[in-house]
Amino acid sequence: MSLVDSEIIVGIDFTQNKRLNQLLSDSAYFPLVLYPADDAFTAQSPLLKEALESASGGEKRKLLVIVVDATWFFAKKMLRLSPNVRNLPKLSFQQLYTSEFTFKRQPAEGCVSTIESCYHLIREMQSADIVPAQIDPEPLMAVFRRMVDFQLEAEQKRIAMGIPGRHSYDAERDVNRKKRQRRQRVENPASSKS
């Protein structure tokens, strides 16, 4: 499972990160940070397509999406500490998605995990003809769903063994989880293929 042409850059403050700054200063790219904002671009934004086509030398600019992989608390901290990332234009989704990360509660409606974000972003970029249709993001969600199922099974084993929970989510108290999962997969079969 991988995203072609992706790189992982680890840290908290990226202000002096040589590799990231090299990418951000490369005129071949149009850099955006995948993060919610009222003025965020979406895949369908005409301004996004204009920005990608406005390269010098007649070549289209490549979309460079910075995906912050952290809890919401640390994602905010990373942006606060990294003005080179914080000041980038934001990229968000056309619509709100419901997270399938049923093991962990999201802080608000429309908040999804990093893997889900990448999946939905690819799908929206495909619908806008920015990403080729032959790129298949389904393996991302297949692995993600297996990970969630594994986490939930481990939680059930923990409960059966009488070990106290350490998370804000506790499957013991969420008796409707499986019903919600089934209903979500029936209502949205395209995103629930494994």
Predicted segments with their positions:
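S-adenosyl-L-methionine/SAH cofactor-binding core of RNA-modifying enzymes
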Residues: 3-84
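C-terminal folded domains that constitute the principal catalytic or ligand-binding module
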Residues: 63-65, 71-194
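Generic structural signal for bulky hydrophobic/aromatic residues embedded
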Residues: 2-3, 121
